[in-house]
Regions:
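Cationic, amphipathic, low-complexity segments that mediate targeting or membrane/lipid association
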Residues: 2-4
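Nucleotidyltransferase catalytic core that binds NTPs
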Residues: 22-23, 27-230
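Short, positively charged and aromatic/hydrophobic N-terminal segments
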Residues: 6, 11-23
Length: 230
C-alpha cells in the first residue's frame, strides 16, 4: 500500500514537473552582452519585450515591476548591476547590499524570463558611446543638487542597458520620482522608441517606502524615516 501511494505521488509529481517546465520555462541568466543580445535577437519581432533595470538587493517593490511587466509584455527582462558611476561616495558603492542568490530566486518566483547579470563593470560599459545631454533643472535640483553627477551616472547606465536590451517598454518605481522623470526625458530627447512607465510605490506595513538601503538603517533611523510619508 505504501509503495502504491509512493508511486502515485511520484507520477503526480512528474506530471506537475513536466507541466511547470512546459508552461513555466526556467529563467535564463546571461552574464555577457553578446550572449544576451543573441538570445533576444531570436525572439519574434511581434513579441513585446519589457525591461526592469535594478541594482539588486531586491524587495517587493522591484518584484511589482516584474509583475507589471508580465501583465503588459510577452517577455520580461531584468538586469542586476550595481552601477559605480551614480555613486558619489566610494563607501556607498562598496557597501551597497548584495545577495544575488536570493535575488535570482525572487525573480524566478515573480515570473521573470531573462536576467542580465554582468560579470563586471566593463561588460556593461565596453561599447559605450558617450552622449551629451542637457536636461536643465530636472537634474540640478532636489537629489541632483545634493548628489552632483548622480543623474549623469544614472542616464549613462540606463542608456547603455536600453541599447543592450532594446525593450519596447521599461518599468521604474515612482519612489525615485525624479529619477523616473529624468529617464523618461532622456528617452524622449534621444528619440528612443521605448515607453518608460512608472509603477506605484510599494510600502512596508508601517508606511515606509520599500528600499534596498532600508536594511542599513538602525531602528531609530527607520522610525525617523516615517516622517517622509507625511
Amino acid at each position: 500500500m505504501r509503495v502504491q501511494k509512493y508511486i502515485k505521488k511520484s507520477i503526480i509529481s512528474n506530471i506537475y514537473t513536466s507541466f511547470v517546465h512546459h508552461f513555466c520555462p526556467m529563467m535564463k541568466i546571461f552574464k555577457t552582452q553578446r550572449a544576451l543580445k543573441e538570445h533576444l535577437s531570436s525572439i519574434e519581432e511581434k513579441l513585446v519585450v519589457g525591461f526592469a533595470p535594478t541594482m539588486g538587493s531586491l524587495h517587493e517593490g522591484h518584484l511589482s515591476l516584474i509583475r507589471e511587466s508580465k501583465k503588459r509584455c510577452d517577455i520580461v527582462v531584468c538586469s542586476i548591476f550595481v552601477n559605480p558611476t551614480q555613486f558619489n561616495a566610494v563607501s556607498d558603492f562598496e557597501n551597497y547590499p548584495k545577495d544575488y542568490v536570493e535575488d535570482i530566486e525572487l525573480l524566478k518566483s515573480a515570473g521573470c524570463d531573462v536576467l542580465f547579470l554582468p560579470n563586471d563593470v566593463d561588460e556593461v560599459y565596453q561599447n559605450e558611446k558617450k552622449v551629451s545631454l542637457e536636461l536643465g533643472n530636472l537634474v540640478n535640483v532636489l537629489e541632483g543638487e545634493h548628489r552632483p553627477g548622480h543623474f549623469d551616472g544614472v542616464m549613462r547606465v540606463v542608456k547603455l542597458l536600453f541599447d543592450i536590451v532594446q525593450p519596447d517598454k521599461a518599468f521604474f518605481g515612482l519612489k525615485d520620482f525624479q529619477q523616473f522623470l529624468v529617464i523618461q526625458k532622456m528617452a524622449k530627447v534621444l528619440n528612443m522608441e521605448i515607453e518608460v512607465l512608472g509603477c506605484d510605490i510599494v510600502r512596508e506595513e508601517n508606511g515606509l517606502a520599500m528600499s534596498s538601503r532600508n536594511k542599513r538603517l538602525s531602528n531609530t533611523e527607520l522610525k525617523n524615516a516615517l516622517v517622509l510619508q507625511k
